[in-house]
Amino acid sequence: IQIQPNYAMAHNNLGITFLELGEKRKAKSSFEKAIKIQPNYAHAYWNLHSLANDIDEALTILKKLYEFDNKYIKAKLMISALKAFKGKFEDFDTLIRSSESNHPMTRSIKWVFSLPKIPKIFFNRWDFFDAIVAQTDKTRPFYEFGVWNGISFKHLIKTFKKGFGFDTFTGIPEDWHNEPSGTYSSFGSVPKIKGGEFIVGKFENTLPKFFSQKRPLASLINFDADLYSSTLCALNYSNNVIDEKSILIFDELITNKNWEKDEYKALNEFCDSLSISYDVIAVSFYSKQVAIKLKK
């Protein structure tokens, strides 16, 4: 940006980085700068909608995008979803009979609207986290399976003061569709975060020992292991710290190309094995997060 201050893509990418770090104001400023430089920059509009305060604001941004780029499929799908959240299902009904009916976002939207109770929708991970945290028992610690560089952990520890994090810190232990093993590595660097206790290693090696001792009930558990196998392992071993007050967040449960084969599959197999169910309380199509409460 210093070399080319009017390079719209650079401002958009900077906004994505700020958003990943939780710097929402800076992210919004960067997306708006990209749009000012290049008014028909669809990706910047798409990212900007993630910072909307409500459905109406998100719809306004996405409709602007779709006016100049009606081939931006994600915008079309999100518009239909947001209208459905407002009780207007015409676009959604058309969508599920269209050529986009098997798009991963369409499948995600269909799943959400098949639920007994429609959950609340959020547009970015930080607003999602804050809304869920507000519903938790803050006297309890939180658990996170998949820490990576600790950005989410740092955000959560501000509220709970004590957290347990589990990760290899050398990346995912097996291939995840098109992502090779070792992706999302922090190169062995374990975060140093006050109040954080980090258990290093593969889940199948560390969780049996950790949970062989009585552990405090969870306020919140953030499942960010991506893999079906790792998520199922984490669910099985953390079951004893989950009760009716615990809220479970799955970081990438929906909208990925193969979402039904990953965290979603692990959650449903776990519940089926125990003959229990769950209530979905929040979703974010943009950040892919889903929050649930188990019905034990």
What are these regions (language model features)?
Residues K138-K296:
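S-adenosylmethionine/decaboxylated-SAM
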Residues M9-E20, H43-S50, L77-M78:
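Conserved alpha-helical positions within TPR/SEL1-like repeat arrays
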Residues Y7, Y41, K71-Y72:
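Residue-level recognition of tetratricopeptide repeat
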Residues A84-T139:
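Class I SAM-dependent methyltransferase Rossmann-like catalytic core
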Residues L21, A52-I55, K86:
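Structural motif corresponding to the intra-repeat A-B loop/turn of tetratricopeptide repeats
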